[in-house]
UniProtKB/Swiss-Prot annotation:
Its main location: host cell. The gene is OPG172. This is Protein A43. GO terms for cellular component: host cell membrane; host cell surface; membrane. The keyword Transmembrane applies. Residues 1-22 form the signal peptide. It comes from Vaccinia virus (strain Copenhagen) (VACV).
Length: 194
């Protein structure tokens, strides 16, 4: 009975790195998409464009830095809002880069917004792109408040990442080695008992 507990615990420990790696990608794909949602405030008073974006940052992240660029051409406003986040209980290095960019077109009564959001997870080398096209909102007293929602979501794993390949190889080698050790140990115990 004691031997069976040892076998189960060793196999569990050998499988954990593989499960942790795949679950982190799944967790990123399902939960971190909420980082792209929030409210976008557009205000145009006295020919000055003011854009304010309040992103939704979950409790599990700490905010590091933010950038905002705004360009205007006729009735079009182009903006890019980027921010860097890290996991609260992770390393000091940023683990997520979120970049929200878009085109806002306005007239006297309404504004139309095209928005795309890129989430780059540096820990798992995965990226998610969310896009939204031609959402129209009413313009009230030169202010347009948009609630950002998306039409399509594309998720992909970065191809040129050499560290994940090394990690995958190491995890598989650990799994094979621990399985061989347990198998040899079990055969020796069976041989000694017979």
């Amino acid at each position: 009975m004691m031997m069976m507990k040892w076998i189960i615990s060793i196999l569990t420990m050998s499988i954990m790195p593989v499960l942790a790696y795949s679950s982190s990608i799944f967790r990123f794909h399902s939960e971190d998409v909420e980082l792209c949602y929030g409210h976008l405030y557009f205000d145009r008073i006295y020919n000055v464009v003011n854009i304010k974006y309040n992103p939704h940052i979950p409790y599990r992240y700490n905010f590091i830095n933010r950038t905002l660029t705004v360009d205007e051409l006729d009735d079009n406003v182009f903006f890019t809002h980027g921010y860097f986040l890290k996991h609260k209980y992770g390393s000091l290095n940023p683990s997520l880069i979120v970049s929200l960019s878009g085109n806002l077109k306005y007239n006297d009564i309404q504004c139309s917004v095209n928005v795309s959001c890129l989430i780059k997870n540096l820990a798992t080398s995965t990226s998610t792109i969310l896009t939204s096209k031609h959402k129209t909102y009413s313009l009230h007293r030169s202010t347009c408040i948009t609630i950002i929602g998306y039409d399509s979501i594309i998720w992909y794993k970065d191809i040129n990442d050499k560290y994940n390949d090394i990690y995958d190889f190491t995890a598989i080698c650990m799994l094979i080695a621990s399985t061989l050790i347990v198998t040899i140990y079990v055969f020796k115990k069976i041989k000694m008992n017979s």
